[in-house]
């Protein structure tokens, strides 16, 4: 059904109320070919596009998410590209922040690029802390950049973000 719409909107799972949308979120990401916004179960107000943070690791999923989010990025007052520096983002073959910044500039979207080292903190916590510190109103990211099996066994950024998010998350795969 999601294939027939520009965007799907799904509420975050809420264990307290017995709502588990993780299967629906995964199915929408993998099978619809369309982006989705996952809304935190604590969300009370309407979607605000004041400040958008885009996670960037140079992956296909990140490229897809940023390009699918172009209509929203154009409406934002501020757009930030956030890079958690690790082995993957340090690789010369990965499209760097300046290149994707030039791409967005061709769409009349100005960005600020922020980087932070991965250190000993897991990536989802780094991202969520940055989103809170920057007062972002929307997070854009690629969803499930690794195989579902790897994400299930080892965990991953997508699962970590979806379990503890406090702002809506725009995702594409």
Residue ranges and their predicted role:
Residues 83, 115, 142-143, 171-173:
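Active-site proximal loops enriched in glycine and acidic residues that flank catalytic Cys/His/Asp
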């Amino acid at each position: 059904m999601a294939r027939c719409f520009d965007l799907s909107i799904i509420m975050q799972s809420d264990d307290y109320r017995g709502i588990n949308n993780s299967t629906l979120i995964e199915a929408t990401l993998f099978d619809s070919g369309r982006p989705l916004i996952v809304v935190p179960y604590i969300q009370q107000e309407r979607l605000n596009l004041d400040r958008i943070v885009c996670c960037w690791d140079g992956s296909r999923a990140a490229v897809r998410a940023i390009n699918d989010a172009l209509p929203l990025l154009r409406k934002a007052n501020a757009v930030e590209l956030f890079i958690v520096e690790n082995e993957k983002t340090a690789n010369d073959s990965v499209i760097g922040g300046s290149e994707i910044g030039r791409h967005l500039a061709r769409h009349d979207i100005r960005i600020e690029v922020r980087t932070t080292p991965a250190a000993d903190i897991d990536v989802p916590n780094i991202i969520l802390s940055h989103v809170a510190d920057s007062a972002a109103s929307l997070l854009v990211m690629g969803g499930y950049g690794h195989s579902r099996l790897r994400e299930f066994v080892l965990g991953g950024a997508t699962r970590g973000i979806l379990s503890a998010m406090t702002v809506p998350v725009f995702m594409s795969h």
